[in-house]
Amino acid sequence: MNDREFYKSFFRLYLVLVLQNIVTLSVNLADNIMLGSYGEVSLSGVTSVNQIQFLYQQLLIAFGDGMVIFCSQYWGKKQFAPMKKIIALAMRFGIAIAVILFAVISVFPEQAMLCFTSDRQIIEEGVRYLHTIRFTYLFFAVTQMLLAALRSTEVAGIALRLSVMALVVNCGINYVLIFGRFGAPELGVTGAAIGTLTARILECGVLIFYVIRKEQYLRLQLSDFLKRDWQFLRDYLKITLPLLVLCGLWGINTAMQTVVLGHMNSAAIAANSAASNLYLMVKSAAVGAASAASVVIGKTIGMGDEELVKRYARKLQILFVILGVTGGIFLYFIRIPILNLYDLSPEAMALANQFLLILSVVYVFMAYQMPSNAGIIKGGGCVEFGAKLDSTCICLIVIPLSCYMAFAAGASPALVVVCLNIDQFIKCIPVFWKVNYGKWMRKLTRETKIAG
């Protein structure tokens, strides 16, 4: 693969994944804008529930990324039979997590909400939302595992089409049911949950139909789920367990923002919701870069050319730096127009503006270290580095410092947000060293007699 083919392969995946992430997050942004117009308490309740969804999504990402790391290397070798074994493993784990979470939320909804806020009104709104949204978990798991499998074979277009469909369906139903338009009942947060559930069911159904009808390499049969290959299971878990730690820590770190700010006041929760949704949308560019880099790096390792992998890693880092600077500037200039779409109190609006000013600077550093770590290092098969780095930063720096500043020192919400994101600055140095001077390339595939 020459440089032209490398850039073509990377940007073809990158652009589709970024657009998919933007459309997906647009669903959440539209939900928040509509719920923000409906009421600040409703917005805060759904925001708290979404932290549960975020933690759940992090677990699915771990199993999905483990699948992609393996499958992309087998994809480089054009061996498809081992890929099916890995995909079936990941799917079983994803479904198991969905069932467990559904059971826990069904039995302990209020206790789950208490982890994120102590405000009784917010808890009541959140429980109403949870009552319906819990039914999305199984459909979401199947969809995410199938999309990860397709991504490992450089197929990403279907993900974008599904996201656009979900955006249209979810926003349309939400508009009707949240506010009670066109003679429909006014359901508030329950209406928002119904819209999300409908979109998730349609996503899952259309994707399964696509895989059955169109996918020639990864079409799974029932027998694929019944087979047991203990060697593949050990290999898969060896990669996935550190990813679970990594994604779990990242989920906890993100949820801590809601936990810490949620115990300040409702204005801080609403401001964080508005700011974080815009930040996450711009962050889609970095997330897409990491996902595309992971597939390209894994595929190249599977082809067996280590010098080519090193050269591509250098080129990718330059792209990540450019992405960080342009993304930070973009976030700075769009913050006011986007915030004006929200019906926030003056206090919440002022806080949201402060948060976004801080996040504009954070973005510059995040857009380098996160894709370099999650795309190059992790995509190369070295997963424990990220787990160790995040464990150190989150457990020893971010959480203790943020809790101290919020609850002991009585710091302002803006200063607390700085503390919650301080790891994005710290991690740049070890990530740069690891990519350029450390060892991170690992061949994970096994020699097999099974023809692809």
PLM regions with names:
Residues L19, V23, V27, Y56-L60, ...:
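Residue-level hotspots within pore-lining transmembrane alpha-helices
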Residues M1-L17, C71-L138, A184-L241, I297-V362, ...:
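Short alpha-helical transmembrane segments in multi-pass integral membrane proteins
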Residues G64, I133-S152, A159-N170, A192-L207, ...:
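Short runs within selected transmembrane alpha-helices of multi-pass transporters and secretion channels
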Residues L43-V107, F140-A159, T258, I269-R335, ...:
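Small-residue-rich hydrophobic transmembrane alpha-helices
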Residues I22, S26-S44, M113-R120, V176-L187, ...:
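Helix-terminus/linker motif at the lipid-water interface of multi-pass membrane proteins
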Residues R12-D31, T132, T143, A166, ...:
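Transmembrane helical elements of multi-pass membrane transporters/channels
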Residues L17, N21, N32-I33, N50, ...:
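Transmembrane alpha-helix boundary and packing residues in multipass membrane permease domains
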